[in-house]
Swiss-Prot record:
In the C-terminal section; belongs to the purine/pyrimidine phosphoribosyltransferase family. The lineage of its organism: Eukaryota, Viridiplantae, Streptophyta, Embryophyta, Tracheophyta. Its cofactor is [4Fe-4S] cluster; Mg(2+). The gene is ASE3. InterPro entries: GATase_2_dom, Ntn_hydrolases_N, PRibTrfase_dom, PRTase-like, PurF, PurF_N. It is an enzyme of class 2 (transferase). Binds 1 [4Fe-4S] cluster per subunit. Binds 1 Mg(2+) ion per subunit. This is Amidophosphoribosyltransferase 3, chloroplastic. It comes from the Eukaryota. It comes from Arabidopsis thaliana (Mouse-ear cress). [4Fe-4S] cluster binds at residues 313, 459, 511, 514.
Length: 532
């Protein structure tokens, strides 16, 4: 079944255009950089044998948010892999739309066919990067895809995945969700051995480790590389006729496996991507597991050195993942609803209406309202057309940022005692503006309820978080934050209550480092100094 971009666009939100922007089109070809004869597609994006950097040949652009996005956490990326479907690239395109919330600054797809590995990558949304003509240049029944959110605020084309590289065994491609805490240490060692890094992405580290490995097969080289990596990684690889999925031994980031009716195997960061392409969810890729899919033997798996305790990111349930996904074996929707119900039990308040900060606070607010026996209403409207921009806004414009993104509904708020539920407070700037906005719209009282515990520490496992000292809860008490944002009361979901949602056994499988400062995998001293 073939899809055109026009057909695909017809089932997607109107806000997602299909206008290309900053897409890699191989307009420059140094002697060591051999492009495909087809337009828009390259066989080698990264050549590990080259002795000089490719960085001068790539364009770069800096995205700056003008809607206060810097006061929210950001998942760094989402991945998809498909094996055994003649429409693998188009299905990857659809799946990446479903994962767009995990990264909005870049997207890419690599397809394997008789010509080798061919890729299209670009800066912007999935619909900005791909058009019908570009997808036509990605034939093949194996493909991997990636959506990216950069940690530094700079989104450069050379950093957009998937990455393609050549080594002694042949060409390979990789897409990665996570973060390696020993990146700088390993990079320094590899550079001392002669490796030249082309990008500033830690994902490139994997390619160099595979290229340097002495193992005789590609799979053994992947295992060899993973044994050297510390931190979070859910990755998909393409090599020859194989699609390989890998998840770190702690299981920090999600990675699920599904199958289409024609037998095609699909890997994705969330089940919502499977749903969109009519793939049936089968299971998670287990922490420490490597799943190999090839044409001759179907799918098989093996395990690397496992860790006795999983440490899955609890923020996947609280904020990052789509409510219609199953993540870590649990419904995201039901888990968030339980957060809200417990929050209403431990932090009740007399009120007339419960509202949410959309979209991530909505399900918890529904749970809070149901448990409190108070009506839930839409008190804040979110504009989904407030996008990131290349224009550096002035401070005066930044002051209007929340108003651009959120609009109060006066008919719901005026004269009411309002409980407003959000998923988290990061720096506190957005919460301050929301409270002011609700009061300006006539709210008699404003009570903030946060569906996760206070954040006091940065995340090193694939989440773009501010430095610890920039987190308001790391330097202020709850009472001080309440006064700072000028609400009538403020309460967070206690950590013990959060763990209670999962029960005494399952709760030990989650990472709470951003709430406790206790990290399951620590950075080296030099890296911690750089991050502080």
């Amino acid at each position: 079944m073939a899809f055109s971009v026009e057909e695909i666009s017809s089932i997607l939100p109107n806000s997602l255009s299909a206008n290309p922007r900053n897409v890699s089109q191989n307009t420059i070809s140094p002697s060591f950089f051999k492009p495909s004869l087809k337009p828009y597609a390259s066989k080698t994006l990264i050549s590990l044998s080259c002795r000089r950097s490719l960085s001068p040949v790539f364009s770069a652009g800096t995205y700056v948010t003008n809607v206060d996005e810097d006061d929210k956490l950001h998942e760094e990326c989402g991945v998809v892999g498909i094996h055994g479907d003649p429409e693998a690239s188009r299905l990857s395109y659809l799946a990446l739309h479903a994962l767009q919330h995990r990264g909005q600054e870049g997207a890419g797809i690599v397809a394997a066919n008789q010509n080798g590995l061919e890729s299209i990558t670009g800066v912007g949304l999935v619909s900005d990067v791909f058009t019908e003509s570009k997808l036509n240049n990605l034939p093949g029944d194996i493909a991997i895809g990636h959506v990216r959110y950069s940690t530094s605020g700079a989104s450069m084309l050379k950093n957009v995945q998937p990455f393609i590289a050549s080594c002694k065994l042949g060409s390979l491609a990789v897409a990665h969700n996570g973060n390696f805490v020993n990146y700088k240490q390993l990079k320094t060692k590899l550079e001392e051995m002669g490796s030249i890094f082309i990008t500033s992405s830690d994902t490139e580290l994997v390619l160099h480790l595979i290229a340097k490995s002495k193992a005789k097969t590609f799979l053994l080289r992947v295992i060899d590389a993973c044994e050297k990596l510390r931190g979070a990684y859910s990755m998909v690889f393409v090599f020859e006729d194989k699609l390989i999925a890998v998840r770190d031994p702690f299981g920090f980031r999600p990675l699920v496996m599904g199958r289409r009716s024609n037998g095609a195997v699909v890997f994705a960061s969330e089940t919502c991507a499977l749903d969109l392409i009519d793939a049936t969810y089968e299971r998670e890729v287990c922490p420490g597991e490597i799943v190999v899919v090839d044409r001759n033997h179907g799918d098989s798996s093996m395990f690397m050195i496992s860790h006795p305790e999983q440490k899955q990111c609890v923020f996947e349930h609280g904020y990052f993942s789509q409510p219609n996904s199953i993540v870590f074996g649990r419904s995201v929707y039901e888990t968030r609803r339980m957060y809200g119900e417990i929050l209403a039990t431990v932090a009740p308040v007399d009120c007339d209406v419960v509202i949410a900060v959309p979209d991530s606070g909505t399900v918890a607010a529904l749970g809070y309202a149901a448990k409190a026996g108070v009506p839930f209403q839409i008190g804040l409207l979110r504009s989904h057309y407030a996008k990131r921009t290349f224009i550096e806004p002035t401070q005066e414009i930044r002051d209007f940022a929340v108003k651009v993104k959120l609009s109060p509904v006066r008919a719901v708020l005026e004269g009411k005692r309002v409980v407003v539920v959000d998923d988290s407070i990061v720096r506190g700037t957005t919460s301050l503006k929301i409270v002011r906005m609700l009061r300006d719209a006539g709210a008699k009282e404003v009570h903030m309820r946060i569906a996760l515990p206070p954040m006091i520490a940065s995340c090193y496992y694939g989440v773009d978080t501010p430095r610890s000292q920039e987190l308001i809860s790391s330097k202020m008490s709850v009472e001080a934050i309440q006064k700072h944002i000028n609400c009538d009361s403020l309460a967070f979901l206690p950590l013990d209550s959060l763990k209670g949602v999962y029960g005494p056994v399952e709760s030990h499988r989650y990472c709470y480092a951003c709430f406790t400062g206790k990290y399951p995998v620590t950075k080296t001293e030099s890296e911690e100094a750089d991050a502080s």
